[in-house]
Each structure stands twice: as structure tokens, then as C-alpha cells.
């Protein structure tokens, strides 16, 4: 195959080759090449390292081309799958599909958490820029910002009615915000000795739980703002706390590679779950609707009969997702496929699927019954840090280090 280079391009290439040979000590080859290519003894400065630069940029371009080809294949598949069919999918089978409905910008640093409001068509994003933003997920409009934290906001949570919002931050505080009228901070709680990484309401709404890098979990009374309990046991940074819908138990995960399930009313750890091989970043309780799919998936692996649950999913820096029966402390299944840390998990309200967000920049949809990844969305330009699935409307939201919040429609 004949290369079509202009005279000037040929001369520049020869100079770059001469520089490469000279700088890597190929003196004899350089001498021969100079004679044959009719080059002067001095190579111009601008050709220094040029050959290596061109080589690495070609490799980068090839990688980009492969990524774009994968996205194109995905989009073509989407057109076929998204087209009207005789067998209409029921809402219980709807999953997020590209492209995103909205890509929302405004935060000036990484997004740390995204959550839906339990009642209104609103969602909330927390960011390392120390602010919380409120958006309308149906229109994509920005509503307002909540300002008060002085460092990265790590997590946000609503009470069951969506009247109160709790937030926690690397500034060591937990704040409660009036989400009905004033949108002002009504309480600030201090007590942790390090970064507060996660926050969650107990379902009745009278208590808030917080998890921290100081290795403890604390329970706070909403009415007074007092710390009423401290749970200890994790050996390293506690990354996330999530309360079971019944409120009698809650789960935490940690850099110590374990998940602990605690009794809310005492300080006792009910069970410690160990199987992950790296920091456990995120956890999510499975809805009751997921029990049959999880049992069917687990049935192939063990013959111990029906699992009662409750079931908990965990995502780790070991790139896997595990699903546990916490009543017996058993890992029932492992989902592998992400190429980087798993940072966020959310169950489909219909119970058939689990969605995950990862540092590999994708969102994956997992078919629980068949223990397989059934869809990969190339979601963000940088790490995906958080994901939420709406309980009643066909929407998924995701947040990323690329400073965007994305809204995905399910169909």
C-alpha cells in the first residue's frame, strides 16, 4: 500500500525518525538513515519526541474509535428495541434507555449523590462544591440551591413524606432542611470527628442515622438534634448507611471490606457480611418484589430451599456486586461485569432488575433472575458516582465526577 505524504510531511517524518534514533542511542542506524534520507546533522528542536507523541495519540484515537463504535452499536440496537412491538413491555420491565432525557449542569465540582423526592417531581443533587441543588426531573429545570455546608456534601436523604431533607458533609456536620416552605437549614448536628459520609432517616422520621470516616454510626433525634446512640464495630471509614423499610434494622458498609447489619433499637450488630475483597462503597435494600427473582437466581447455586430475606445488595471497589440474605448472613449471588469500582446501586421497583453506577463511566442494568448484565449505558464522561430509581415514575437519575446530573427515561 502506497503512503500518500507530501514532500513537507515526508521531510518532517524523516526529522522525527532521526530524533527518535538519536535520543535512543541508535548511532549507527542514525548515521545510515541520515545519509539515505539526505538529512543535515542537526535535528530541529520542534521534532524532539514527536514520533512518540504521534504514536501515543494514534493509540488514543484507536481507543476512542472503538468506544464510539460500541456506542453506535448500542444506539442501533436501541432503535430496534425501542421501536413499537407486538409484545409491549409492562412498566415492571421498563429499564433506562439512552440517550438521556436531560443532562443538567450547574454544579462546580463532582456530584456525590442524586436522589428523587418521594412525592413531588423533584430530585436533589449533592456536590463537592458544598451545595445541594433541587431540580424538576420532568422539565429539567433548576429550582434552587441549598447553601450552608462549608465543604463537600457527601450524602442527602428525605424523610418518608419528603418534608425534611438531611445532608451530611466533610465539614463534620449533619444538617436538616425544611423542604416544605422555607428551604432553610433548621438544625445542624455536630459530633463526628471526621468526614460524615452518609445519612439516612429511620422510616418513622423521628431519627436520623449518620456514618463517618471516624468509624462510627450515630443516631440523632430530629426534634432536638441530640445524638442518642453511637454504634461502633467497623474498623475503618464507614461509607454508607441505609435503613430497611421496616425500620428495625439498618446496614452499613466500610473500607474494612465488610457490611454490618445492626438492630436499630439497640447498639448490637446482628450480622457481619464478609466476602468482598476491597472497600464496600454502596449498599441498597431489595424491595419485597425482588424476592422471587433473587430466590430463583440463588436456587441454581444452593439447594437450601427458599430464602426469606431481607435481601441487601452491595457494591465494591473489587468491581463486583453481591446480594445477601441478611437473616442468615449468606451471599446468594455475585454480579460481575463492571471494569472499575461500583459506586451506586438502586433496585427497580418492580423487583426484576438492579441498576448500578461505576467508575467505568457506565450504568449497568442487571437481570436478577438470570444473574446477567442485560444493558450497559455509556452514561458519563467521567466516573459515575450515584444512581437512583424512582419508585413510581419511569425515571432513573445519575450523577458523576463530570459535574453533570442526568435524567434517563425508562421504557
Swiss-Prot record:
Keywords: Cell cycle, Cell division, Centromere, Chromosome, Coiled coil, Cytoplasm, Cytoskeleton, Developmental protein, Differentiation, Kinetochore, Microtubule, Mitosis, Neurogenesis, Oogenesis, Repeat, Transport, WD repeat. Residues 56-83 form a coiled coil. Expressed primarily in germline cells during oogenesis. Low levels are detected in the germarium in regions 1 and 2 and in both nurse cells and the oocyte in stage 2-4 egg chambers. Enriched in the oocyte during stages 5-7 and in nurse cells in stage 8-10 egg chambers. Ubiquitously distributed in early embryos. Expressed throughout cell bodies, dendrites and axons of the mushroom-body neurons. InterPro entries: Dynein_regulator_LIS1, G-protein_beta_WD-40_rep, LIS1_N, LisH, PAC1-like_LisH-like_dom, WD40/YVTN_repeat-like_dom_sf, WD40_repeat_CS, WD40_repeat_dom_sf. Residues 9-41 form the LisH domain. CDD domains: WD40. GO terms for molecular function: dynein complex binding; microtubule plus-end binding. It holds the Pfam family WD40. One of its GO terms (cellular component) is axon. It is found in: Cytoplasm, Cytoskeleton; Cytoplasm, Cytoskeleton, Microtubule organizing center, Centrosome; Cytoplasm, Cytoskeleton, Spindle pole; Chromosome, Centromere, Kinetochore. Its main location: cytoplasm. PROSITE patterns: LISH (PS50896), WD_REPEATS_1 (PS00678), WD_REPEATS_2 (PS50082), WD_REPEATS_REGION (PS50294). Belongs to the WD repeat LIS1/nudF family. Dimerization mediated by the LisH domain may be required to activate dynein. Positively regulates the activity of the minus-end directed microtubule motor protein dynein. May enhance dynein-mediated microtubule sliding by targeting dynein to the microtubule plus end. Required for several dynein- and microtubule-dependent processes such as nuclear migration during cell division, mitotic spindle formation and the removal of mitotic checkpoint proteins from kinetochores at the metaphase to anaphase transition. This is Lissencephaly-1 homolog.
Amino acid at each position: 500500500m502506497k503512503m500518500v505524504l507530501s514532500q513537507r510531511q515526508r521531510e518532517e517524518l524523516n526529522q522525527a525518525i532521526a530524533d527518535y534514533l538519536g535520543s535512543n542511542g541508535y548511532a549507527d542506524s542514525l548515521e545510515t538513515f541520515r545519509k539515505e534520507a539526505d538529512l543535515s546533522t542537526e535535528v530541529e528542536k520542534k521534532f524532539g519526541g514527536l514520533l512518540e507523541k504521534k504514536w501515543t495519540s494514534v493509540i488514543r484515537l484507536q481507543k476512542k474509535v472503538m468506544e464510539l463504535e460500541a456506542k453506535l452499536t448500542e444506539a442501533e440496537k436501541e432503535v430496534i428495541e425501542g421501536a413499537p412491538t407486538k409484545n409491549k413491555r409492562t412498566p415492571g420491565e421498563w429499564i433506562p434507555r439512552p440517550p438521556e432525557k436531560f443532562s443538567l449542569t450547574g454544579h462546580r465540582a463532582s456530584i456525590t449523590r442524586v436522589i428523587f423526592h418521594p412525592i413531588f417531581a423533584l430530585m436533589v443533587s449533592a456536590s463537592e462544591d458544598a451545595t445541594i441543588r433541587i431540580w424538576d426531573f420532568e422539565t429539567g429545570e433548576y429550582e434552587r440551591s441549598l447553601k450552608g455546608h462549608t465543604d463537600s456534601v457527601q450524602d442527602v436523604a428525605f424523610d418518608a413524606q419528603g418534608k425534611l431533607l438531611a445532608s451530611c458533609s466533610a465539614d463534620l456536620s449533619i444538617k436538616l432542611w425544611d423542604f416544605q416552605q422555607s428551604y432553610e437549614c433548621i438544625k445542624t448536628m455536630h459530633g463526628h470527628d471526621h468526614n460524615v459520609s452518609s445519612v439516612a432517616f429511620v422510616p418513622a422520621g423521628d431519627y436520623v442515622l449518620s456514618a463517618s470516616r471516624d468509624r462510627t454510626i450515630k443516631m440523632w433525634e430530629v426534634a432536638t438534634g441530640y445524638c442518642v446512640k453511637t454504634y461502633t464495630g467497623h474498623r475503618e471509614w464507614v461509607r454508607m448507611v441505609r435503613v430497611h423499610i421496616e425500620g428495625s434494622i439498618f446496614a452499613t458498609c466500610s473500607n474494612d471490606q465488610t457490611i454490618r447489619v445492626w438492630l436499630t433499637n439497640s447498639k448490637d450488630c446482628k450480622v457481619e457480611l464478609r466476602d468482598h475483597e476491597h472497600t464496600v462503597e454502596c449498599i441498597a435494600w431489595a424491595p419485597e418484589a425482588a424476592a422471587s427473582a433473587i430466590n430463583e437466581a440463588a436456587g441454581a447455586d444452593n439447594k437450601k430451599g427458599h430464602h426469606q430475606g431481607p435481601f441487601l445488595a452491595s457494591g465494591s471497589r473489587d468491581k463486583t456486586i453481591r446480594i445477601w440474605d441478611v437473616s442468615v448472613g449468606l451471599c446468594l449471588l455475585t454480579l460481575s461485569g463492571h471494569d472499575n469500582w461500583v459506586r451506586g446501586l438502586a433496585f427497580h421497583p418492580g423487583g426484576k432488575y438492579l441498576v448500578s453506577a461505576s467508575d467505568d463511566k457506565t450504568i449497568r442494568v442487571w437481570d436478577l433472575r438470570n444473574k446477567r448484565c442485560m444493558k450497559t449505558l455509556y452514561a458519563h464522561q467521567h466516573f459515575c458516582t450515584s444512581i437512583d430509581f424512582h419508585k413510581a415514575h419511569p425515571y432513573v437519575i445519575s450523577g458523576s465526577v463530570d459535574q453533570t446530573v442526568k435524567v434517563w427515561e425508562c421504557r
